[in-house]
C-alpha cells in the first residue's frame, strides 16, 4: 500500500490506463493525429471516425442520440453554454431561472452573471438532508420561468436528487430543465429519456478520463435551441466552435464505455467500501453524516467531527488525500456554502471532511484510513478546550465569547 492514500475521487480521478492507451494512439505521426474537420484526406477521415465512435460511446451511457452530444472543454463550459445559451435564446419568452443554493459554482456564478444582465434567479434552499421537494420547485415556477437548473448528484455531500419527478414537472409546464450530472454519470444509471431532461452537463475527468474535455447533451425532440457562446468555424453543429481535440474525445469515449460496462459491479464494491469506512468511524462521539445516507451516490461520505477544526484535521490526516469541500473552493478558509445551506453552523461546517472513494481504492486503504482518523480525532480533541467544555456539560451555544 502506497501513501498518501487518495480519497478525493470527487475532485478528480486518475486516468484509467486503458483510457491513456487509447489516447496515445491519437497523437503522433503514426496515429490518428488528423483534424476531424479535414474532409479532403484520410488523416481527417480517420480522426473523424474516432470522434464519431467516442460520440456514440458518450451517448450510449446516458441513453441519448449521438447527434445530441456537443463536446466542450469540460463541465464548467457545458454549464455556461446550457444556462447562458438558453437564457439568451429564449429571452423573449421570459427572464426567470430557478436553481438551488447547493449547485456547483459553475452554475451559481453563471446565474449571477445573468442577474447582472437583467435576468431574475430564484435560489432554492434544500431540506437539512440536502434534498429538494417537488412542491418547493413547483412553488418557485412562474409564468416567465424559462429554465430550471438542478444538479443530479451534489459534489460535496453526494445526495441524489429525484430528477425524473422534476423533469416531469418542468415538461408539464413547458419549462426547460438543465441538469449538472458531473457526479452521477458513470456512477449511477442516467437515462435522459427516463429523467426527462433537456440539457445535461458531463465531464470526463470524474469518470477516469482526461481533464479538459466534457460534453453537453442537448435534446433534439422536442428541440432545444441554444445561443452559441464560442464562435468560429461552426463545429459541433454551430453550438461550440473549435478544432476537436481527438485524443481527449477518444479518451472520454473509452472512459464512458468502461463506466457503462463496470458500473453495477464497481458501484457495489465502492458502496461496500463506503459502508466499511462509515462503520469504522460512526461510533466516535459527536460525529455526524452530512446529506441523506439512503439517496446517495456510492463513493461519497461527508462527515462532521464536532469540536475539531477542519484544517487541523486535514493536516493530521496528511496520509489521506481528502478535502473539506469541493476542490474549487478548497483554497478558501470559508466554511462550505453547501453545508451552510443545509443549516449547519460555521463550527460544524468547518469540521467536515469529504471522503470519496473510487475505482482504485482498496479495503486495506480504508482500514488504514479508519485507524488514522480514530487516532487523529482522539489526539486533536484532547488538545481542544471546546471538547473539554463539552465533556463538562457546558452548552457551547450559550457561551458569550469575548470579541477582541
From Swiss-Prot:
It is an enzyme of class 2 (transferase). GO terms for cellular component: L-cysteine desulfurase complex. The active site is at residue 328. Belongs to the class-V pyridoxal-phosphate-dependent aminotransferase family. NifS/IscS subfamily. Master enzyme that delivers sulfur to a number of partners involved in Fe-S cluster assembly, tRNA modification or cofactor biosynthesis. Catalyzes the removal of elemental sulfur atoms from cysteine to produce alanine. Functions as a sulfur delivery protein for Fe-S cluster synthesis onto IscU, an Fe-S scaffold assembly protein, as well as other S acceptor proteins. It is found in: Cytoplasm. This is Cysteine desulfurase IscS. It catalyses: (sulfur carrier)-H + L-cysteine = (sulfur carrier)-SH + L-alanine. [2Fe-2S] cluster binds at residue 328. The modification N6-(pyridoxal phosphate)lysine is found at residue 206. SUPFAM superfamilies: PLP-dependent transferases. The gene is iscS. Gene3D superfamilies: Aspartate Aminotransferase, domain 1, Type I PLP-dependent aspartate aminotransferase-like (Major domain). GO terms for molecular function: 2 iron, 2 sulfur cluster binding; cysteine desulfurase activity; metal ion binding; pyridoxal phosphate binding. It holds the Pfam family Aminotran_5. Homodimer. Forms a heterotetramer with IscU, interacts with other sulfur acceptors. Keywords: 2Fe-2S, Cytoplasm, Iron, Iron-sulfur, Metal-binding, Pyridoxal phosphate, Transferase.
